[in-house]
Amino acid sequence: MQFLWLCLLSAVTLQFTGTLAFYPIKLPDFTKGIISHHGSVGRRFFTFPGLYKHAHTGSTTLNIRRGPSNYRRDNNYPAQIASPPTAPNTLGINNDGYDFSYFSEVKVGSEGQKMWMLIDTGASGTWVFGSDCTSKACGRHNTFGKEDSKTIKVTDEKWGVTYGTGKVSGVIVNDTMSFAGFELVTPFGSASTASDDFLNYPMDGILGIGPQDPNAKTPTVVQLLMQQKLLKSNVIGINLQRASEGATDGQITFGDIDKSKFSGELIYSNVVPNGYQWEIAMDDLIMDGKSLNLKGRTGIIDTGTSFLILPPADADLIHSMIPQADKGSGFYTLPCSTKVDIKLSIGGVEYTIQPDDYVGNETATKGTCNSLIVGRQILGPKQWLVGDVFLKNVYSVFDFDKNRVGLAARKYAGTKNPPSSTPSPGMFLLHAIHCQKTISVLMLHIDPTSNKAPSGGSPGLPAESGSDSTTNGEATNGATSSPNSSSSVLTPTWLTLAVFFAIGSSLWS
């Protein structure tokens, strides 16, 4: 297995101690036909063909004062901007309009340079594009450097993230980051070079909020918040919005839980033993009421991953339950009208995955869409990468003190088909072997010459029953845990940001 690490580096001499990787996926053909979603056509517009079947045709409509709108930065990346949050220590999460990447505005340096930062629970490292970067990709993003801040301290410590097809690299800098009511002095990576792979990415950097390897020498952004006792409690609550619903209430809350964003109670699952990711045990997958008996699986809960990515054998089984699903050239397609009820059972609760979230855009064959459940062997034989296809349906809580993940059914106020969760007949306690120490990036690649829209593109041990109740009506289940300007609109002819995640420990010492 090849490796990749997205990491916040310490202010000491850093050396690579592992192999780094990038996983491209070539998807089948597409058409430029767009299917309207089932909601109000007037609520949302895109300026180019959508990746999901609910995108619209039509010219850009800007509504500055009210309702969801397609706000556009000087560097011409589209976004569905989140409504200003009302809860304290909360940051709005913007959507790229396709539910593929979620990012927030962070102010960096003494002058408050605005940067769009990918919210990534799959990595603990933080970095931005540096103003000294001359790469083409940097010219299409907001950058940050000496001219933007009086307080920046540039070190000579090298930093880099390498992909199979390119890389981003530079040095470590120290400066302030302001977000969600906090102002924090922190080290982070400043990219002086970046490959063309970043040309169409909306984000100007990554804000890593994954758990840190306890052996790492440098604290992460979240660790600094905790060390300085700036958080009410050492938890982070996240709800992602679904673009097709016209929702703009995506947000991340630092130090608290927003109970208005979910229904029912939060059910917690402990992170697998010795895991340095938000990896938890999963019970099963249920389709139209039938258990697939997918026992012993674990899932890495990752906001930086667009899809539900799982071993090919599991993907084959799931699609065998969907009428007329076809593997074709290696990536599944299914009828655009698919309404199969899919529930992922975690911690004894079945969480619905809406068809709008797993059915992608239409292919060259009328009435046939791409599946956003992707079979790809990038982890262990029983490890899943549980991304936004699932996370749009839940409110997720990441508890750093108790090393656990909490989930509850997401509440979409005033929208159609709200997600639901159903208690399972029994609780399961799944133990999982520690995941391979690998770090990977998976992206869906579309032919750059095409003008067609892309699609929304460790072995387990036997299960045993058991659950532990906690206070405040919560329950716990699981294994015991130890902008620069561009002259033209950037059309995403290849998928901009499918997956950013990190598994294991730091590749630097």
Swiss-Prot record:
EC main group: hydrolase
Compartments reported by the entry: Cell membrane
Listed InterPro entries: Aspartic_peptidase_A1, Aspartic_peptidase_AS, Pepsin-like_dom, PEPTIDASE_A1, Peptidase_aspartic_dom_sf
EC code(s) of this entry: 3.4.23.-
UniProt membrane topology term: Lipid-anchor; GPI-anchor
Molecular function GO terms recorded: aspartic-type endopeptidase activity
Name used for this protein in its record: Probable aspartic-type endopeptidase CTSD
Organism (species): Arthroderma benhamiae (strain ATCC MYA-4681 / CBS 112371)
Top-level taxonomy: Eukaryota, Fungi, Dikarya, Ascomycota, Pezizomycotina
